[in-house]
Amino acid sequence: MFHTVGIDVGCDSVKTTLMAFEDDGSQPRLLFKDLDKIRKRNIKHVVRSAFERALLRHGLDEADIAYVATTGEGELVDFRRGHFFSMTAHARGAIFLDPSVRAVVDCGALHAKAMLIDERSKVLAYRMTSQCASGSGQFLENIARYLGVAIDDIGELSLRGDSPEQVSGICAVLAETDVINMVSRGISTANILRGIHLSMAKRLIGLMRMVKTNGDVLVTGGLARNPGFVAAMQEMADNDKRLNANIKIHPDSVHAGAIGAALWAGYRHLRLQGQPTAQSQAA
């Protein structure tokens, strides 16, 4: 048996996972998962703290970890051995969490991506939003702050909206102006939030069409924890006659990138040892 660690460093949080494998890389098991908000702390300290918590929880030393892999802003992890692109990591993590999915929508703080994948997590096609677009978690946090609503509450609150008004779908600045106008017109907070979620979902459904999504789609990233956003995604998917998509989430969707990094770490470790991997044997 050997262990790997996957670390997904985002702009507002660090996700860390610890996985165990059989000697041939088979039967990967998720032993530890952690999400830590960065806030104004030193990112390297946040990363190191999460790593040490994982070791302590399972009675391991740093020398017991066969491979540490990162994704996201991995250059901030000075003890990593390897780094994997975000799409590669999220795709691998998604297949681990739900083998039925053939597409992934990764909704992060700064941008979102739609990926078409195969059963072995290979990314076949992808599209992504721009950093300034109104389809990101950071945009949603800005709106929540303006409305005086806790970020953890906006999803449930948006589900109460019964007459939503959608905002501008491309530019975050214009969308925020729309929200200010809605507040001045007396639109309820629930309807504003539901309209925002629907507008964000509409943009992402457009990305899904571009990559020719068909079948089960797993939402990963921070917005997977937002029930209002997930509901808006399914509503928009159901209303799009050009798309056949079933939106899914998993309790560990937010950790998909870190899980994928840990899984690829196991693959890389065996390759470096000159051993055949479970993945290569299945090919």
Where are the regions that the model predicts?
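Phosphate/ATP-binding catalytic cores across multiple sugar-kinase/actin-like superfamilies
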Residues: 53, 192-214, 264, 268
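Short glycine-rich, Thr/Ser-proximal phosphate-binding strand/loop in the N-terminal lobe
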Residues: 3-45, 49, 123-132
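Glycine-rich phosphate-binding/hydrolytic loop that grips phosphoryl groups
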Residues: 140-141, 248-283
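Glycine-rich phosphate-binding loop plus the immediately following alpha-helix
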Residues: 39, 122-163
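Glycine-rich phosphate-binding loops at beta-strand->alpha-helix junctions
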Residues: 209-236, 250-254
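Adenine-nucleotide phosphate-binding core of ATP-dependent small-molecule kinases
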Residues: 175-207, 254
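Short beta-strand-loop/turn "lid" adjacent to the catalytic site in phosphate-handling enzymes
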Residues: 34-40, 54-88, 115, 124
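Conserved phosphate-binding/catalytic loops in two-lobed NTP-binding clefts
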Residues: 86, 234-259
